[in-house]
Amino acid sequence: NNRRSFLKKIGAAGTVAGVSSLTPILVSALPSEMTNNNTTFEKDKTYTLDILQTTDVHCQVHPHDELFWENDKAVFRRTGGYPQMATYFKKARKSNPDTFIIDTGDMFQGSELSVKTTGKALVPVLNQLGYDLYLPGNWEVIYGKRNMQTLLGALDAPKVCANMYHDLGDGKRGELIFLPYYIWNVRGVKIGFLGYTDPLVPIRQSPNYSKGILYTPAEENLAHYVSVLKEDERCDYVIVIAHLGLSQQIYLANLPQCEGVDYILGGDTHERVREPIQCKYAKVVEPGAFGSFVGSLKLTVVNGKITNDTYELVEVRAADLKADK
Protein backbone atom coordinates (compact mmCIF):
# COMPACT_ATOMS: atom_id res chain seq x y z
CA ASN A 1 0.00 0.00 0.00
CA ASN A 2 1.51 3.32 -1.12
CA ARG A 3 0.22 5.34 1.84
CA ARG A 4 1.20 2.75 4.44
CA SER A 5 4.76 2.40 3.15
CA PHE A 6 5.19 6.16 2.95
CA LEU A 7 3.90 6.74 6.48
CA LYS A 8 6.34 4.10 7.71
CA LYS A 9 9.14 5.96 5.95
CA ILE A 10 8.30 9.38 7.38
CA GLY A 11 7.86 7.83 10.80
CA ALA A 12 11.44 6.58 10.65
CA ALA A 13 12.61 9.97 9.45
CA GLY A 14 10.78 11.68 12.28
CA THR A 15 12.62 9.51 14.80
CA VAL A 16 15.91 10.53 13.25
CA ALA A 17 14.96 14.20 13.46
CA GLY A 18 13.89 13.95 17.06
CA VAL A 19 10.25 14.49 16.13
CA SER A 20 8.13 12.80 18.76
CA SER A 21 4.82 13.06 16.93
CA LEU A 22 3.58 13.52 13.40
CA THR A 23 1.28 16.44 12.69
CA PRO A 24 -1.53 16.26 10.08
CA ILE A 25 0.56 18.36 7.71
CA LEU A 26 3.13 15.55 7.58
CA VAL A 27 0.71 12.65 7.47
CA SER A 28 -1.13 14.18 4.52
CA ALA A 29 2.02 14.24 2.39
CA LEU A 30 2.19 11.61 -0.32
CA PRO A 31 4.55 11.24 -3.29
CA SER A 32 3.09 11.75 -6.72
CA GLU A 33 1.30 8.68 -8.06
CA MET A 34 2.88 9.44 -11.43
CA THR A 35 6.38 8.87 -10.11
CA ASN A 36 8.04 5.54 -10.75
CA ASN A 37 9.14 3.92 -7.51
CA ASN A 38 10.08 0.63 -9.16
CA THR A 39 13.10 -0.66 -7.26
CA THR A 40 13.77 -3.52 -9.68
CA PHE A 41 16.29 -3.41 -12.50
CA GLU A 42 17.53 -5.68 -15.27
CA LYS A 43 21.14 -6.79 -15.14
CA ASP A 44 23.48 -4.70 -17.32
CA LYS A 45 20.61 -2.49 -18.49
CA THR A 46 21.24 1.26 -18.41
CA TYR A 47 18.61 3.45 -16.74
CA THR A 48 18.42 7.24 -16.63
CA LEU A 49 16.90 9.00 -13.65
CA ASP A 50 15.76 12.53 -14.48
CA ILE A 51 15.43 14.95 -11.55
CA LEU A 52 13.63 18.11 -12.67
CA GLN A 53 13.74 21.29 -10.60
CA THR A 54 11.82 24.55 -10.61
CA THR A 55 12.30 27.35 -8.13
CA ASP A 56 11.20 30.91 -7.43
CA VAL A 57 8.20 30.73 -9.75
CA HIS A 58 6.54 33.43 -7.62
CA CYS A 59 2.97 32.69 -8.76
CA GLN A 60 3.66 33.51 -12.42
CA VAL A 61 0.76 31.46 -13.72
CA HIS A 62 0.95 32.66 -17.34
CA PRO A 63 3.84 33.02 -19.80
CA HIS A 64 5.74 36.28 -19.56
CA ASP A 65 8.47 38.16 -21.43
CA GLU A 66 11.87 36.96 -20.25
CA LEU A 67 15.07 38.85 -21.00
CA PHE A 68 17.96 37.05 -22.71
CA TRP A 69 21.32 38.43 -23.79
CA GLU A 70 22.22 36.93 -27.17
CA ASN A 71 24.80 38.08 -29.72
CA ASP A 72 25.44 41.23 -27.67
CA LYS A 73 21.77 42.20 -27.83
CA ALA A 74 18.82 42.14 -25.45
CA VAL A 75 16.21 39.64 -26.64
CA PHE A 76 12.79 39.01 -25.11
CA ARG A 77 10.96 35.68 -25.41
CA ARG A 78 7.70 34.40 -23.92
CA THR A 79 8.60 31.80 -21.34
CA GLY A 80 7.11 29.99 -18.37
CA GLY A 81 3.46 29.57 -17.44
CA TYR A 82 2.08 26.73 -15.33
CA PRO A 83 0.05 25.26 -18.24
CA GLN A 84 3.23 25.15 -20.32
CA MET A 85 5.20 23.66 -17.43
CA ALA A 86 2.50 20.99 -17.04
CA THR A 87 2.93 20.04 -20.69
CA TYR A 88 6.69 19.86 -20.25
CA PHE A 89 6.38 17.66 -17.16
CA LYS A 90 3.91 15.30 -18.84
CA LYS A 91 6.18 14.92 -21.86
CA ALA A 92 9.14 14.28 -19.58
CA ARG A 93 7.31 11.58 -17.62
CA LYS A 94 6.02 9.94 -20.80
CA SER A 95 9.52 9.90 -22.25
CA ASN A 96 11.08 8.64 -19.02
CA PRO A 97 8.96 7.13 -16.23
CA ASP A 98 11.97 7.46 -13.92
CA THR A 99 11.41 11.20 -13.51
CA PHE A 100 11.25 13.02 -10.16
CA ILE A 101 10.05 16.65 -9.99
CA ILE A 102 10.87 19.11 -7.21
CA ASP A 103 10.22 22.76 -6.43
CA THR A 104 12.62 24.56 -4.12
CA GLY A 105 10.50 27.42 -2.88
CA ASP A 106 8.82 30.79 -3.30
CA MET A 107 5.63 29.41 -4.79
CA PHE A 108 3.01 31.43 -2.87
CA GLN A 109 4.22 35.04 -3.24
CA GLY A 110 4.48 37.33 -6.23
CA SER A 111 1.08 38.03 -7.78
CA GLU A 112 -2.26 39.71 -7.12
CA LEU A 113 -3.95 36.32 -7.42
CA SER A 114 -1.92 35.04 -4.50
CA VAL A 115 -2.51 38.13 -2.37
CA LYS A 116 -6.28 38.11 -2.88
CA THR A 117 -6.56 34.41 -1.99
CA THR A 118 -3.79 34.26 0.64
CA GLY A 119 -2.02 31.82 -1.65
CA LYS A 120 -4.90 29.33 -1.76
CA ALA A 121 -5.50 29.71 -5.51
CA LEU A 122 -2.08 28.21 -6.21
CA VAL A 123 -2.68 24.96 -4.31
CA PRO A 124 -4.81 23.12 -6.93
CA VAL A 125 -2.50 24.37 -9.68
CA LEU A 126 0.59 22.97 -7.98
CA ASN A 127 -1.17 19.69 -7.20
CA GLN A 128 -2.16 19.29 -10.85
CA LEU A 129 1.48 19.67 -11.87
CA GLY A 130 2.32 16.52 -9.94
CA TYR A 131 5.40 17.61 -8.03
CA ASP A 132 7.12 14.91 -5.98
CA LEU A 133 8.82 17.06 -3.36
CA TYR A 134 8.81 20.64 -2.07
CA LEU A 135 11.13 22.89 -0.09
CA PRO A 136 9.75 26.06 1.54
CA GLY A 137 11.48 29.24 0.36
CA ASN A 138 12.03 32.51 2.17
CA TRP A 139 8.64 33.86 0.96
CA GLU A 140 6.51 30.91 2.09
CA VAL A 141 6.08 32.83 5.37
CA ILE A 142 4.55 35.87 3.64
CA TYR A 143 1.12 35.20 5.19
CA GLY A 144 2.46 34.03 8.55
CA LYS A 145 3.41 30.67 10.03
CA ARG A 146 -0.09 29.22 10.34
CA ASN A 147 -0.99 30.05 6.74
CA MET A 148 2.33 28.63 5.59
CA GLN A 149 1.53 25.35 7.30
CA THR A 150 -1.98 25.32 5.85
CA LEU A 151 -0.81 26.04 2.29
CA LEU A 152 2.06 23.56 2.30
CA GLY A 153 -0.08 21.00 4.10
CA ALA A 154 -2.63 21.20 1.27
CA LEU A 155 -0.01 20.19 -1.29
CA ASP A 156 -0.04 16.50 -2.15
CA ALA A 157 3.71 15.88 -2.17
CA PRO A 158 6.08 15.71 0.82
CA LYS A 159 7.89 18.77 2.12
CA VAL A 160 11.40 18.76 3.59
CA CYS A 161 13.41 21.33 5.52
CA ALA A 162 16.06 20.53 8.13
CA ASN A 163 16.51 24.03 9.57
CA MET A 164 13.03 25.37 10.39
CA TYR A 165 11.90 24.74 13.97
CA HIS A 166 8.90 25.67 16.08
CA ASP A 167 9.83 28.63 18.30
CA LEU A 168 8.71 27.84 21.85
CA GLY A 169 9.66 31.29 23.12
CA ASP A 170 12.58 32.55 25.21
CA GLY A 171 15.00 31.12 22.66
CA LYS A 172 13.75 27.57 23.17
CA ARG A 173 13.77 25.42 20.05
CA GLY A 174 10.93 22.98 19.45
CA GLU A 175 10.55 20.25 16.87
CA LEU A 176 11.30 20.55 13.19
CA ILE A 177 8.28 21.90 11.32
CA PHE A 178 8.97 19.64 8.35
CA LEU A 179 10.79 16.37 7.87
CA PRO A 180 14.50 16.88 7.22
CA TYR A 181 14.83 14.55 4.25
CA TYR A 182 13.08 12.32 1.73
CA ILE A 183 14.38 9.24 -0.11
CA TRP A 184 13.55 8.21 -3.66
CA ASN A 185 14.13 4.46 -3.97
CA VAL A 186 14.22 3.53 -7.65
CA ARG A 187 16.02 1.15 -10.04
CA GLY A 188 18.23 -0.30 -7.33
CA VAL A 189 19.50 3.03 -5.97
CA LYS A 190 18.43 5.35 -3.18
CA ILE A 191 18.53 9.10 -3.75
CA GLY A 192 18.44 11.18 -0.57
CA PHE A 193 17.02 14.72 -0.68
CA LEU A 194 17.95 16.95 2.27
CA GLY A 195 16.32 20.39 2.51
CA TYR A 196 17.57 23.79 3.73
CA THR A 197 16.01 27.23 3.46
CA ASP A 198 17.56 30.62 4.15
CA PRO A 199 18.22 31.15 7.88
CA LEU A 200 18.38 34.91 7.27
CA VAL A 201 14.60 35.14 6.70
CA PRO A 202 13.90 37.03 9.97
CA ILE A 203 16.58 39.58 9.02
CA ARG A 204 16.00 40.10 5.31
CA GLN A 205 12.21 40.30 5.71
CA SER A 206 9.91 41.60 8.40
CA PRO A 207 10.34 39.32 11.43
CA ASN A 208 6.55 39.36 11.83
CA TYR A 209 6.28 37.12 8.75
CA SER A 210 8.25 34.31 10.38
CA LYS A 211 7.08 34.80 13.96
CA GLY A 212 6.95 31.41 15.68
CA ILE A 213 9.76 29.92 13.60
CA LEU A 214 13.42 29.45 14.53
CA TYR A 215 15.94 29.09 11.71
CA THR A 216 19.41 27.58 12.02
CA PRO A 217 22.41 27.65 9.65
CA ALA A 218 22.55 24.67 7.31
CA GLU A 219 26.04 23.75 8.50
CA GLU A 220 24.73 23.18 12.04
CA ASN A 221 23.26 19.75 11.25
CA LEU A 222 24.28 19.09 7.64
CA ALA A 223 27.05 16.60 8.48
CA HIS A 224 24.68 14.75 10.82
CA TYR A 225 22.00 14.26 8.20
CA VAL A 226 24.50 13.38 5.48
CA SER A 227 25.74 10.65 7.81
CA VAL A 228 22.17 9.50 8.44
CA LEU A 229 21.47 9.31 4.71
CA LYS A 230 24.76 7.62 3.80
CA GLU A 231 25.27 5.30 6.77
CA ASP A 232 21.81 4.59 8.19
CA GLU A 233 19.60 4.95 5.12
CA ARG A 234 22.31 3.61 2.76
CA CYS A 235 21.70 6.26 0.11
CA ASP A 236 23.79 6.04 -3.04
CA TYR A 237 23.48 9.73 -3.88
CA VAL A 238 22.79 12.74 -1.67
CA ILE A 239 21.23 15.94 -2.97
CA VAL A 240 20.76 19.09 -0.91
CA ILE A 241 17.76 21.04 -2.13
CA ALA A 242 18.31 24.59 -1.00
CA HIS A 243 16.80 28.05 -0.96
CA LEU A 244 19.87 29.89 0.27
CA GLY A 245 20.98 31.98 -2.69
CA LEU A 246 23.92 31.19 -4.96
CA SER A 247 26.65 32.67 -2.76
CA GLN A 248 25.49 30.79 0.35
CA GLN A 249 25.09 27.59 -1.66
CA ILE A 250 28.65 27.85 -2.99
CA TYR A 251 29.88 28.64 0.52
CA LEU A 252 28.09 25.55 1.86
CA ALA A 253 29.48 23.31 -0.90
CA ASN A 254 33.02 24.25 0.16
CA LEU A 255 32.54 23.48 3.86
CA PRO A 256 33.78 20.15 5.31
CA GLN A 257 30.25 19.55 6.62
CA CYS A 258 29.17 19.11 2.99
CA GLU A 259 31.40 16.11 2.41
CA GLY A 260 29.24 13.28 1.06
CA VAL A 261 26.83 15.60 -0.75
CA ASP A 262 26.84 15.16 -4.52
CA TYR A 263 24.73 18.12 -5.69
CA ILE A 264 23.13 21.26 -4.32
CA LEU A 265 20.00 22.11 -6.30
CA GLY A 266 19.60 25.71 -5.24
CA GLY A 267 17.28 28.67 -5.41
CA ASP A 268 16.49 32.16 -4.09
CA THR A 269 18.72 34.47 -6.16
CA HIS A 270 17.12 33.61 -9.53
CA GLU A 271 20.49 32.74 -11.10
CA ARG A 272 20.60 30.91 -14.44
CA VAL A 273 23.40 28.43 -13.85
CA ARG A 274 23.97 26.62 -17.13
CA GLU A 275 27.08 24.68 -16.12
CA PRO A 276 27.35 23.11 -12.65
CA ILE A 277 29.71 25.00 -10.35
CA GLN A 278 32.20 22.44 -9.06
CA CYS A 279 33.05 23.24 -5.45
CA LYS A 280 35.26 21.31 -3.06
CA TYR A 281 32.58 18.89 -1.89
CA ALA A 282 29.57 19.27 -4.21
CA LYS A 283 28.33 20.71 -7.47
CA VAL A 284 25.98 23.71 -7.30
CA VAL A 285 23.26 24.76 -9.75
CA GLU A 286 20.26 27.10 -9.80
CA PRO A 287 17.53 27.13 -12.50
CA GLY A 288 16.58 30.80 -12.86
CA ALA A 289 13.11 31.91 -11.81
CA PHE A 290 9.46 32.56 -12.72
CA GLY A 291 9.02 29.17 -14.40
CA SER A 292 11.18 30.30 -17.32
CA PHE A 293 13.52 27.35 -16.84
CA VAL A 294 13.62 23.80 -15.57
CA GLY A 295 16.83 22.31 -14.25
CA SER A 296 17.38 18.72 -15.38
CA LEU A 297 19.83 16.51 -13.48
CA LYS A 298 20.22 13.14 -15.18
CA LEU A 299 21.75 10.21 -13.31
CA THR A 300 22.90 7.11 -15.19
CA VAL A 301 22.28 3.84 -13.34
CA VAL A 302 23.68 0.41 -14.22
CA ASN A 303 23.31 -2.67 -12.01
CA GLY A 304 22.15 -0.62 -9.05
CA LYS A 305 25.04 1.83 -9.23
CA ILE A 306 25.15 5.47 -10.37
CA THR A 307 27.84 5.74 -13.02
CA ASN A 308 27.42 9.31 -14.30
CA ASP A 309 25.55 12.58 -13.86
CA THR A 310 24.82 15.40 -16.31
CA TYR A 311 23.00 18.70 -15.92
CA GLU A 312 21.08 20.92 -18.33
CA LEU A 313 19.20 24.20 -17.91
CA VAL A 314 16.10 23.88 -20.08
CA GLU A 315 14.19 26.94 -21.30
CA VAL A 316 10.41 26.68 -20.96
CA ARG A 317 9.68 28.39 -24.26
CA ALA A 318 5.95 29.08 -24.49
CA ALA A 319 5.87 28.92 -28.30
CA ASP A 320 7.10 25.32 -28.19
CA LEU A 321 4.76 24.07 -25.47
CA LYS A 322 1.01 23.91 -25.92
CA ALA A 323 -0.85 24.91 -22.77
CA ASP A 324 -2.06 21.87 -20.86
CA LYS A 325 -5.84 21.87 -20.30
Predicted regions and their residues:
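Acidic, metal/ion-coordinating pockets
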Residues: L7-G18, L22-A318
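Hard-cation-handling environments
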Residues: A323-K325
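Secretory targeting signals
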Residues: N1-S5
